[in-house]
Design a protein with these regions (language model features):
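N-terminal pre-triad scaffold of radical SAM enzymes
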Residues: 5-32
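Conserved Radical SAM active-site core
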Residues: 2-6, 20, 35-121, 125
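Glycine-centered flexibility motif
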Residues: 17-19, 28, 47, 69, ...
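Hydrophobic pocket-lining residues within nucleotide cofactor-binding pockets
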Residues: 29, 77, 142
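Auxiliary Fe-S-binding modules of radical SAM enzymes
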Residues: 5-15, 63-65, 94-196
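Ubiquitous "structural anchor" signal
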Residues: 25, 82-83, 148, 163
Length: 196
């Protein structure tokens, strides 16, 4: 089995999630959204092999008080072969920086959460392990006709910024699947003082 490749790593990234982050762009995506911002990463062979030394460098980069966490995007992190290449790494990051440590893990996917549920198009034997480590999941394909420059952390209005911790808690409380318990992230100060 070939190792996963990565197209780029951005240290001190302020565009792809809250705060200052290390962002890993994995290689490989079969979706081919029109006007994708990163079509260079569609090719699974693009970039360099994602090996243990690269993992170590990323984990080390998170060990600064001014770094808020890791963002995984691409390419498509949830392509089945990329999930296989990411699962151990994501669990290593979560073990090094547990929930509540102040370091968050964001993931951007062209899949909707429903496609990552059991029976879904991109659900594999490791999907649940990856989802369990995520604080935020930005889901849905980029749709040029729904492009909106005013949106934070997403390109088109169909995409959702899902608060995975709140979603997991609600799913457990209500005894339903994650996709039936979606809690959206809110960053507008209006929301912090009003219950919706």
């Amino acid at each position: 089995e070939l190792p996963m490749n990565y197209a780029n790593i951005k240290y001190f990234d302020i565009a792809d999630g809250e705060g200052v982050r290390t962002s890993l762009f994995v290689s490989g995506c079969r979706r081919g959204c029109k006007n994708c911002f990163n079509s260079v990463a569609w090719d699974f062979a693009a970039g360099e092999p994602f090996d243990r030394a690269v993992e170590d460098k990323i984990i080390e980069s998170l060990d600064h008080p001014f770094i808020d966490g890791l963002t995984i995007l691409g390419g498509e992190p949830m392509e089945p072969e990329n999930q296989a290449g990411l699962v151990d790494f994501v669990e290593r990051v979560r073990a090094a920086y547990p929930a509540g440590s102040g370091k968050t893990i964001w993931c951007f996917t062209g899949d909707v959460l429903e496609e990552l549920m059991p029976g879904g198009r991109h659900h594999t034997e490791v999907t649940d392990r990856i989802l369990a480590c995520l604080d935020m999941l930005v889901d849905g394909p980029f749709v040029q006709d729904l492009y909106d420059i005013s949106l934070r952390f997403r390109g088109s209005s169909n995409q959702r910024v899902i608060d995975m911790n709140a979603t997991r808690a609600r799913a457990e409380r209500e005894g339903v699947a994650l996709c039936d318990a979606v809690e959206l992230w809110r960053d507008d100060p209006v929301y912090s003082t009003h219950t919706m």
